[in-house]
Amino acid sequence: TMGKGEGFTLHNTKMNYTDRCGVCKDIAGSLISFLRMAGLEAYPAMTMAGSRVESIPADHFNHCVAVVKLSNGTYMPLDPTWVPFCRELWSSAEQQQNYLPGVPEGSDLCITPVSAPENHYFRIKANNKLDKNGKLTGQFTLTAEGQSDLNIRRIFTTGWQSDWKNSMESQLLSISPKAKLLKVDWSKNPKDYQAAPIKITFWYEIPDYAIIGNDEMALVPLTMHGLYDQVRSYLRIDTDIPERQYGFKDGCSRLVELDETIQLPQGYRLVQSVEDNRKSPAADFEGYIRQENNKIDIHQKLALKKRVYEAGDWNGFRTAVNAHKAFGNHLIINK
């Protein structure tokens, strides 16, 4: 950088490359140059990453992005700093965020739109079998898109290839130190994030997974046992608080879909079925736990509709998330 006097001034592209500048404004400036070379109308914009900007003339900015003019005359924000290895052009970790475009006609403060939960789905489909000794064997497939994809794929795009399998194994070991990863399939080239949403399939066995009593067992559904909790940022929000006076934030809007079947040992039955359904402007939840023949079927669908919530959204958000968390309680099966 220039040192003293650097400020918010964008350098020209030649200086960015000859001086090897590399902060956000230099990355955004380079993108603007490339877009203009392609015949598009593009300009810089300022924002405050992760926070709001007050509607007063003051320095409330810490991040430089770009805007490009579309055929309908509107401007689309682009963030080349945040979207490498992400399947978006504007990071939805910055949704509902203020920005100020530096366009010739002038502009008031703008705000980025909400991204629909299904743009950031996180899905696990698991098929498991429990034996009479409490050992669980099975297979699950994980798929994700948007910000959920970015989080899960990070080990492949920025990590050492020699660590890939260890990272997969650590997900199972977080469930039980006895867990064994038998096989994992992360597709042909998981680093190619632009090809398709991430998909990983695990095969495993976990001895002593269930707690055994006299003609009964207790177990937590595998899909609620800590798998990829780093993606589920909503779990880090304290939903024991009954009321909030102020707004709150999550990492991103998100759709979580968890489906699991558990084949039971001969003669065992699920003690109690569960069904729940919650809807609100902030979040929705639907789910059930029930037995069909000798299998337990578990289904959950949690839709978190925003990144930035108002205090009035708390009851709907809290109710949906707590209903989802309750599906992580122990299931009791007996003869």
Task: Go through the PLM ranges and name each one.
Residues 1-335:
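A sensor for short, sequence-defined functional sites
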